[in-house]
């Protein structure tokens, strides 16, 4: 099968979040499964700086962006068997960052038009075209409405993956003519209109052959008013083509037996290396080196979406316990300030690190006993899976991908891979935290069994790849 991905970012070339991880990993797994895979990305200035010497020029042409004629260069490289093509236009993509400009609508309108017109020129007409989030969600619409006259495109099946429904691409309806060069018929009849705006995500949901999300629970949640971001009724209407597939993680990169960022390696049969990493981490972040105290890790953006308003409200109560917490992250200045203040009040119990540090993050995943992740909503989440790979048990709010990946501790069977609570409130966070502390202190054999189950969980991309292939094969025979 010929599969083409079109996305706004993709590791290792450009990455701001989970979308970049998916584009870096899923195509590689599909190639291993025997498929022909290509990816189209914007050619950002950071790509030029880091990978420019490895990328070759292929061709160039002009793209009509409404009344504008814009230069479009095509560049190419091959990595892990995947052919990466880049859309080059320095005016649109040499901005020093991926998102956040006033003209993002024009930038990604150009990118989508260029990607569609590039397919013929690079001689890669896919059986399956997989687009991601609002930045490329207009492509299924454009294929069926603007480019339907191109015979080579007639049999292309499309999949839209929603990584985060909050970001929908809502713009003035004038963009249809001014940038995309199409009529207003589909806006006038309501197909593309939402809240009196052109909504790219709605267009993708209605025009793609299939819609996927990054976990089964999130697929269900976005059809409710609580998580649907005002598109829940549209998603309910299209529910027959909506499904969820949990993202994977790189099982080779996040491997406690080989991780190059760790001082000591270990496995589920021998956790002595984990204990040594714990002592090393305590020393590094300025906490008393104690093997007996439960060490809790947090690696996150410090935002309300991640549940840190509830954590801050609970923190004084939590820190009355004989416990240590190490936090790594940046975000809302109010939360940064709160954690910094608590670290001054409880210097032997809380280490607050307001920064971004890849090595420290990896050490937290590997060395801690518990990993706190009480997100208000979480489409998939990767940190809880990384923590489990290292035998660090997640304590999570049962939502989205957290619900799908963390098996809550069952005291009757003594089974599970972590701890969870359903109602996001200080009371239930504290109650679940106490349950975990009691198990850690009084039932070490059960705790050890949970660690083993967590480390044996399969979150590899090869497993996720099989689910995506089932989805693709439902469209392409």
Curated annotation (Swiss-Prot):
Keywords: Glycogen biosynthesis, Glycosyltransferase, Transferase. GO terms for molecular function: alpha-1,4-glucan glucosyltransferase (ADP-glucose donor) activity; alpha-1,4-glucan glucosyltransferase (UDP-glucose donor) activity. It catalyses: [(1->4)-alpha-D-glucosyl](n) + ADP-alpha-D-glucose = [(1->4)-alpha-D-glucosyl](n+1) + ADP + H(+). It is an enzyme of class 2 (transferase). Pathway: Glycan biosynthesis; glycogen biosynthesis. InterPro entries: Glyco_trans_1 (IPR001296), GS/SS (IPR011835), Starch_synth_cat_dom (IPR013534). ADP-alpha-D-glucose binds at residue 15. Belongs to the glycosyltransferase 1 family. Bacterial/plant glycogen synthase subfamily. This is Glycogen synthase. It comes from Streptococcus pneumoniae (strain 70585).
């Amino acid at each position: 099968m010929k599969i083409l991905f079109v996305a706004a970012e993709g590791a290792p070339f450009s990455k701001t979040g989970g979308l970049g991880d998916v584009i870096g990993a899923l195509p590689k797994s599909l190639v291993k499964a025997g498929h022909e895979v290509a990816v189209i990305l914007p050619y950002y200035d950071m790509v030029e700086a880091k990978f420019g010497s490895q990328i070759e020029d292929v061709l160039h042409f002009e793209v009509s962006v409404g009344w504008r004629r814009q230069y479009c260069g095509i560049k190419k490289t091959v990595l892990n068997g995947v052919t990466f093509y880049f859309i080059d236009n320095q005016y649109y993509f040499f901005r020093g960052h991926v998102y956040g400009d006033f003209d993002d609508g024009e930038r990604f309108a150009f990118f989508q038009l260029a990607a569609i017109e590039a397919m013929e020129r690079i001689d890669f007409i896919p059986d399956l075209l997989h687009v991601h989030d609002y930045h490329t969600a207009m492509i299924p619409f454009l294929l069926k409405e603007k480019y339907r006259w191109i015979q080579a495109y007639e049999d292309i099946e499309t999949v839209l993956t929603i990584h985060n429904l909050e970001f929908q691409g809502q713009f003035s309806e004038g963009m249809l003519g001014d940038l995309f060069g199409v009529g207003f018929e589909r806006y006038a009849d309501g197909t593309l209109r939402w809240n009196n705006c052109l909504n790219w995500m709605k267009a993708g949901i209605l025009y793609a052959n299939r819609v996927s999300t990054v976990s089964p629970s999130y697929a269900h949640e976005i059809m409710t008013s609580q998580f649907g971001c005002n598109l829940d009724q549209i998603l309910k209407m299209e529910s027959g083509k909506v499904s969820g597939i949990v993202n994977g993680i790189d099982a080779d990169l996040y491997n406690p037996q080989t991780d190059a960022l760790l001082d000591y390696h270990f496995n589920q049969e021998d956790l002595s290396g984990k204990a040594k990493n714990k002592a090393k981490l305590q020393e590094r972040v300025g906490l008393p080196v104690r093997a007996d105290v439960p060490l809790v890790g947090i690696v996150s953006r410090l935002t309300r979406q991640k549940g840190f308003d509830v954590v801050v409200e609970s923190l004084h109560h939590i820190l009355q316990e004989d416990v240590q917490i190490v936090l790594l992250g940046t975000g809302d200045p109010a939360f940064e300030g709160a954690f910094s203040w608590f670290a001054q009040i409880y210097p032997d119990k809380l280490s607050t690190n307001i920064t971004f540090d890849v090595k420290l993050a990896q050490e937290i995943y590997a060395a801690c006993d518990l990993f706190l992740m009480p997100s208000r909503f979480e489409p998939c989440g990767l940190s809880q899976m990384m923590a489990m790979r290292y035998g660090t048990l997640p304590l999570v709010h049962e939502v989205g991908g957290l619900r799908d990946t963390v098996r809550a501790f069952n005291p009757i069977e003594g089974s599970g891979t972590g701890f969870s609570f359903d109602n996001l409130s200080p009371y239930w966070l504290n109650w679940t935290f106490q349950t975990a502390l009691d198990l850690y202190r009084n039932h070490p054999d059960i705790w050890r069994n949970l660690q083993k189950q967590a480390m044996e969980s399969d979150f590899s991309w090869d497993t996720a790849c099989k689910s995506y292939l089932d989805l693709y094969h439902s469209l392409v025979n």
